[in-house]
Each structure stands twice: as structure tokens, then as C-alpha cells.
Amino acid sequence: MGKRLRVQRHGRGTPQWRNRGHLRVAPGRYPSPEVLKLDETYEGYVVELKHDPGRWVPLAHIVIPNVADFWIPAAEGMYTGQKVQIGPNAAPVNGNILPLYAIPEGTQIFNVEIRPGDGGKLARSGGAYAILVGKSGNSAIIQLPSGKVKQVNAKARATIGIAAGAGRDEKPLLKAGNAYYKWKAKAKKWPVVRGVAMNAVNHPHGGGNHQSPGYPTTVARNAPPGQKVGHIAARCTGRGCKQAKARLGLK
């Protein structure tokens, strides 16, 4: 009998796969509309900038006296003691939080909500930003870091500027140990070993005198867990797959 696959062990959810949430500083979200009214403007200040393990962007601790204190992804150039305005009447300057309908078109924004009150869902990683392309009625159109254009609610909040932490990928890891600790902070299993490099007892693609599955790797959608690896329920595979999809009108 073969050993359990990586995906089977992952699905069981033992501690080695669980997110190290107890090390996190805070969720990094905007306060709910019950705490900060969407139609009112507040003024706070940055108390602290802190690294959050497992997150690609530092967090800023914002305090609004006698109202709220919260952590959000910091903007590039944000500093301790900086005044931050939150609301529709806030100035559209770096670090301030405004609803999309109050932000000029063409502005760089990050930590963008999809719906008012969800706390921020888009462009949250270090160095990421979206661009407000246009506004129409109750909707706003933004261009995401991927280049995709998305329509969101115009009352959704966003932070002006670019998320801090840009350039983190420019420093090389240099050795495998650094990569190990990098992914350990995010509860990601590393390194990921290919199935064909394993022994036959460890994986359906393992074994043999050379690294090849030795048979077609397409498996059924309802295949049992120990067998369900490779091209799952694939319509086509190989060189002619792209042409076949084009003939069928598929993406």
C-alpha cells in the first residue's frame, strides 16, 4: 500500500499546515461602518509602524482619539506621527483614506474595498497599487496591479498612495534556508517535490529508471484521493490543447 500524498496530508489539516495566525499583529482592515461612519470625516495619527510576520507589507497603527484605533497596510512614505484623514472630505494625499467617489480619477490607490465595509480586499501586497480609471453613478472602475479592470462600489474605501514594502523581491534569497523561513511564516510547505522525483510508494508518478510518469496523467473528476493527481478531468493535454480549445471556443 502506498503512502498518503501531500494533498491528502494537507487536507487533514495537521499543525504543520495551519496558518501561524497567533503570530500576526492584526487583520489589517478598515474599521466597520458602525465604528467609522462612511459619511463622516475623522482625523487620526500614525502611532507605530510594525512588521507583521507572514505579510509582505508593514502595518500602520492608526489612532483616532476617543473613536477608534486600528491597523492597516502602511503607505509608501508613511511615518510615525503623520496625520491621517479618513472620510469623504479628506484631502486626497498620501496615506489618507477616502471613498472612491471622492478620489480624483487617475489616482494611485491601494487596500481597496469591493463593497463598503468589507475592510479592504484589493491591492494589499507590498508595492501594489491600483489606479482609479473612472466613475459612473454608484460604481467606480479601477485597474488592478495585474492590469485587469474591475468595477466596484463607489462608496468603497481606499488608501491614497502605494503600499509600503516595494522592492522586497529585489534582494536575492541566496540560500535555501532563507526560502524555508520565508514560506514557513506563511505556513507554506517548501520545498515542493515533483511526483516523478519520488519513489513509487510515495506518488503515482514516482519510480522507474527515469523521471517520467510512464502513462497518461489524466484522471477522472471522481477519482479517489490517492489517485487524484496530474491532469484532473482535463478536456485535452499536450501541444494540441490550445488549438483544440480554440476550436471549441474555450479559454
Curated annotation (Swiss-Prot):
Region annotated Disordered, chain positions: 1-22
Ranges of compositional bias, category Basic residues: 1-12
Cellular component terms per the entry's GO annotation: cytosolic large ribosomal subunit
SUPFAM superfamilies: Nucleic acid-binding proteins, Translation proteins SH3-like domain
Function: One of the primary rRNA binding proteins. Required for association of the 30S and 50S subunits to form the 70S ribosome, for tRNA binding and peptide bond formation. It has been suggested to have peptidyltransferase activity; this is somewhat controversial. Makes several contacts with the 16S rRNA in the 70S ribosome.
Family of this protein: Belongs to the universal ribosomal protein uL2 family.
Protein name: Large ribosomal subunit protein uL2
Organism: Ignicoccus hospitalis (strain KIN4/I / DSM 18386 / JCM 14125)
Gene it is expressed from: rpl2
